[in-house]
Structures are given as structure tokens and as C-alpha cells.
């Protein structure tokens, strides 16, 4: 069986460091590992419209922004197909067929859907498209016969729902769809990076993000304003590491060489944590260290992005080429689905028998 990756992002804004440690960095590693036959990376504009139907311009403006972020982090269009979801109409038809395999009550039990309905204040009036987007995601994944879906922890319920749809379809119509597996980040801190305000999730809509394209002074300003341990009022006070976003970010970003370069009095992060917990280490010092670490990580990404910004026609051609490949692959899967469901009427020689 071919090893195939499908992953992607909603174009509702520029991508941030939560995307980077949660998925983007891993995508680049997998892309360069040589272990996968095909990689599809989707700019999920149709999904973004499920809660932005009254503001399509917002989605339109961010198509290229997301593509630029992909190219800046190292996604190689020679190794991965970057495509736009709405340019693959077969996905909509697959979603329609899968809707018959999922109950309303099952969608209501999806923890990710429940949390996002609450976050977006949709409790009293839920758009149908938004409510059913786990089914749309299942269409996205199965259309490309994905075996692996790199994603953050918050996407686990979505993958489970997709697997249920695959199991049900294959049980009813015969073995047709490929069963996908989720691939979570190995670093626990990368599963869900908190916002700079200490909230559970970094989110564009909450305004608590550090963007991959942020300028150095903006990054520093955001880091220096980060939430820490509210009980750590004086330098000499013992501080808490658990639930402290600054240390969560250091878990996700810092490497031993960063200590040698930026904070040589400590050999590693464990030593820094021990000192903070003991007392005698101020928040300003650890924030300055985090700033140095993140500037080192984000500078080459920002520079590559600025280079691609000068080549926008080439970026558009990359999206066109990727979308053409994606459409061809999805069309083949849809043909198999229609055949299994026995609704490929004009391809069926037994129709009149």
C-alpha cells in the first residue's frame, strides 16, 4: 500500500507558532524523510467558509498568506502537492454521500465540534456547513487515500469520526476507502501550544498568537508580555513550571545549543526549571532567553517568506499545479466510491439487465 499524507490549514489568517510546532515542522520532516509516496497539503478554504460565509474576502485574502507560510517553513512543491480545497469539487460529492452514514447525535457528541460551537457562540444557531465539517474532513482525507494525517491533539476526535465513516462505508459497500492514522507530535509541549495569554489554545480569533511572519520587535513585545506564574511575584519566590506558558514554549522550541549560545550558565532546560522552582530566577530573564530562542528559529522562516513575496506569480502557479494533481486523484477515488455504491449508472453495462 502506498504511504500517503493529507494535512492542511484553514486560510483565516497567517499561520502562527502553534501551527509550526503542532504540524508544520513535522510536515517538513516527513516530506524530507523519503518514507511517503505522496504528500497532499490542503488550503481548506471551503471549510473556512463554514464560519465565515458572510466574509469570503477574509478567506480569499489569506489563501496566498497560508501558501507563503508553507513555502517559508520549507514545504517543497517538488515533494508535496499544495492545493486549494474548493478547486477539487469531488470533495463536495464525497461529503454528500458520507452524510448518509453519520447521525446528528454522533456529530453532536464530537468534542471538537462542541468546543468550537461554544467558542464561536453558535449554540443557538449553528450553520449546517459548520456542524457537518467533520464529514467534510473525512472526504478530504479519504479522497487522497491518506494513510497518515499529521495533526495536533485537538484533531483526534475528527480523525476518529473519519475512521468510523471509513469503517461504515466499507462494511456497507465493500472495501473501498483507506483507513487513516493520526500522527501526533512526539514532543508533548507541541500537542497544543497555549496562547501568550495563558489560554489553553493559541488561536487567531483570540488574538493570542505569535505569527511566523511577525517582525522581531513584535515577537519580543509579545514574549515579554506573556503570562507566567501569578504567584511568582519576586525573583526570590519559588515558581511553578507546570502550566507556565514560558516554559511550555521553551519545551517546544529550546535545544541544548541554545543554552550554550544564549544562556551558558545553564547546560539544559532541566537546570533552568530547577532554578526557577527553587527561587532566585526572575521571569524577565527566562523571557529574554525565550525571545533569543524564538528569534533564532523564526528569522530564517521570515526571510524565506519575504523572498517568496517577491515571486507571487510563481506561488499561484504552484497552487494551480497542486490543485490539478489533487483533482485528478480525488476524481479517481470518487469513481471507485460511485462504483462501490452502484451509482455509476452509465459505466455499468448491467444497468438494463
Please name every model-derived segment.
Residues 1-3, 346-347:
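Extreme N-terminus of proteins, especially the signal/transit-peptide cleavage junction
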Residues 2-139, 257, 296-298, 306:
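N-terminal Rossmann-like or analogous alpha/beta NTP/dinucleotide-binding catalytic cores
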Residues 11, 149-150, 208:
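A generic structural motif
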Residues 113-115, 119-169, 173, 194-195:
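Internal, conserved structured core segments that host functional sites
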Residues 157, 163-353:
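Conserved nucleotide- and phosphate/pyrophosphate-binding catalytic cores
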